[in-house]
A protein has these predicted regions:
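Non-transmembrane, membrane-proximal soluble domains of secreted or membrane proteins
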Residues: 1-179
Length: 179
């Protein structure tokens, strides 16, 4: 699962399952359905299988965010131009919640994370449905993400060079960008 932080929502990519992508935004209070949690539920939940080791790759499109899901013991920064990695294994079906745990701007408090853990069979059914649902939405998300990845490569070179020397002139690291 690839996770991309944005001001102020998350994008999720499933590269091992057809590479479909969707955005997950907080559900406004006046649109909540019975059983949905205020400030915690999203319009689209991440769906993951129980009992499987899952690689989580995280980055950001704009500023520093933090993808935090306490029940998984995960709290990892999403950094523009960098891909951070961790692994999880969910052992029990259910819905798990988290939030952006890094102050990232004015609407930081409205970046919930909602994950639904399901059986392997239900996950496969969901993937089949999601591949169709998210492939049929032609909103330009995939091209924007491809462009973002190119911009991130360029930004990484710039960031590596600009942060190699502190304001008082101390050299912290040698930039290897472009070598």
């Amino acid at each position: 699962l690839k996770i991309i932080g944005h001001q102020w929502y998350w994008s999720y990519e499933y590269p091992d399952h057809g590479n479909f992508t969707f955005d997950a935004n907080m559900i406004p209070e006046d649109e909540l359905k019975p059983g949905q949690k205020r400030l915690m539920d999203t319009d689209y939940r991440v769906v993951l299988p129980v009992g499987k080791k899952i690689q989580l790759l995280m980055t950001s499109d704009d500023v520093l965010h933090n993808w935090g899901v306490p029940s998984f013991g995960v709290k990892l920064d999403t950094v523009p131009g960098r891909l951070n990695e961790t692994w999880v294994q969910i052992n029990k079906s259910g819905v798990y919640y988290g939030v952006c745990s890094e102050l990232c701007g004015g609407n930081h408090a409205y970046m919930p994370i909602a994950i639904e853990a399901v059986s392997e069979a239900d996950f496969k059914k969901w993937v089949t449905k999601a591949q169709t649902e998210f492939a049929s939405v032609d909103d330009g998300v995939a091209p924007k993400l491809a462009a973002t990845e190119k911009v991130d490569e360029d930004a990484t070179a710039s960031v590596n060079a600009s942060f190699a020397i502190t304001p008082n002139g101390i050299r912290l690291a040698q930039s290897t960008a472009g070598q």
